[in-house]
Amino acid sequence: MGLWALLPGWVSATLLLALAALPAALAANSSGRWWGIVNVASSTNLLTDSKSLQLVLEPSLQLLSRKQRRLIRQNPGILHSVSGGLQSAVRECKWQFRNRRWNCPTAPGPHLFGKIVNRGCRETAFIFAITSAGVTHSVARSCSEGSIESCTCDYRRRGPGGPDWHWGGCSDNIDFGRLFGREFVDSGEKGRDLRFLMNLHNNEAGRTTVFSEMRQECKCHGMSGSCTVRTCWMRLPTLRAVGDVLRDRFDGASRVLYGNRGSNRASRAELLRLEPEDPAHKPPSPHDLVYFEKSPNFCTYSGRLGTAGTAGRACNSSSPALDGCELLCCGRGHRTRTQRVTERCNCTFHWCCHVSCRNCTHTRVLHECL
């Protein structure tokens, strides 16, 4: 008789549940490990001797997978671009959610966004999309700036483009940015569960948004600015424009399930497809963000969920929107206090060359959640 048969029924059932949950937990813990390199771009431990020689002493690089480290080695100069893109994505995330209960908090160390990424909620969807977009955006821009040895401007668009303009200049290399972003970011995902599919979908949604927001820029040529001929190229959007689009997609995100529920004849490709939880809704497009788990309310502190709550947050007493005290403070009320602030004012430029200012003191009214 085996040891398993000697265990009480409730113990064996508990162990079975724990073992079943283990692969998903491991996959969740491995997701986003590359975010730990966020400070590499400003690290003194990274020494770059030339574009063709990098000496890396940064401990956080151990958080990368073997494939990710290989991609870094094969593309000298790209590590700073990846880290810089991640930093920009973090700033954009904080900006987009600055007036909401969840305000994209971050922490030092390998777990940049905290425990919220262990949940399959909307907030996790946005985090994956904006960080993926940040890498694609930064790498594409670095290519056109000549900061990465393995890529340049996108010179494929050449020749006449229309009756009064032609392609020229230095287009941002969005194709290289998307390809590298897909290879680098997606390789950090492990497993074949719903979380895996959700993360991959949202990663791609971030990259797709950067691509779809590309714009054509032109420069005029001709006598006295007559603009008889124009030279045009493709330019990346600002990351703020990408963040605005992704925040709108966050508000309209699709709740999903595995595809082909109840079918025993589904192929592997069909099983690895996301379908809306509500059959009346259309399937998510490549631009949409997807999630499968309801978000916490973020009102109170929870160590288990990694939520800080909204106590002490500044709110707008006259706003009915998400930044208003009623919604942001979750109905708990708010306190009002005054603060005397001294700022520079009435500044004047003197030739040549200095600026003189006065110090002005005024009273600021602050409202904070209880």
From Swiss-Prot:
Q: Which GO terms describe its molecular function?
A: cytokine activity; frizzled binding; morphogen activity; protein domain specific binding; receptor ligand activity
PTM per UniProt?
A: Palmitoleoylation is required for efficient binding to frizzled receptors. Palmitoleoylation is necessary for proper trafficking to cell surface. Depalmitoleoylated by NOTUM, leading to inhibit Wnt signaling pathway.
GO BP annotations listed: animal organ regeneration; astrocyte-dopaminergic neuron signaling; bone development; branching involved in ureteric bud morphogenesis; canonical Wnt signaling pathway; cell fate commitment; cell proliferation in midbrain; cell-cell signaling
One Gene Ontology CC term in the entry:
cytoplasm
Keyword terms, alphabetized: Developmental protein, Disease variant, Disulfide bond, Extracellular matrix, Glycoprotein, Lipoprotein, Osteogenesis imperfecta, Osteoporosis, Proto-oncogene, Secreted, Signal, Wnt signaling pathway
Is Thylakoid among the key words of this record? no
Residues annotated as glycosylated are N29, N316, N346, N359
Instruction: Quote the annotated effect of G177C.
Output: In OI15; completely fails to activate the Wnt-regulated beta-catenin signaling cascade
Q: What is the effect of changing R235W?
A: In OSTEOP; completely fails to activate the Wnt-regulated beta-catenin signaling cascade
Q: What are the disulfide bonds?
A: C93-C104, C143-C151, C153-C170, C218-C232, C220-C227, C299-C330, C315-C325, C329-C369, C345-C360, C347-C357, C352-C353
Asked whether the UniProt record includes ATP-binding among its keywords, one would answer no
Residues with lipidation of kind O-palmitoleoyl serine: S224
Q: Where in the cell is it found?
A: Secreted, Extracellular space, Extracellular matrix; Secreted
User: Secretion signal: which residues?
Assistant: 1-27
UniProt cross-references to Pfam families, sorted A to Z: wnt
Q: Which SMART domains match?
A: WNT1
Q: Which InterPro entries match?
A: Wnt, Wnt1, Wnt_C, Wnt_CS
The annotated consequence of E123D reads:
In OI15; reduced capacity to activate canonical Wnt signaling
Regarding protein family, the annotation reads:
Belongs to the Wnt family.
The subunit structure is: Forms a soluble 1:1 complex with AFM; this prevents oligomerization and is required for prolonged biological activity. The complex with AFM may represent the physiological form in body fluids. Interacts with PORCN. Interacts with RSPO1, RSPO2 and RSPO3. Interacts with WLS.
Outline what the protein does: Ligand for members of the frizzled family of seven transmembrane receptors. Acts in the canonical Wnt signaling pathway by promoting beta-catenin-dependent transcriptional activation. In some developmental processes, is also a ligand for the coreceptor RYK, thus triggering Wnt signaling. Plays an essential role in the development of the embryonic brain and central nervous system (CNS). Has a role in osteoblast function, bone development and bone homeostasis.
* Involvement in disease: Osteoporosis: A systemic skeletal disorder characterized by decreased bone mass and deterioration of bone microarchitecture without alteration in the composition of bone. The result is fragile bones and an increased risk of fractures, even after minimal trauma. Osteoporosis is a chronic condition of multifactorial etiology and is usually clinically silent until a fracture occurs.
Protein name per its UniProtKB record: Proto-oncogene Wnt-1
Q: Which organism is it from?
A: Homo sapiens
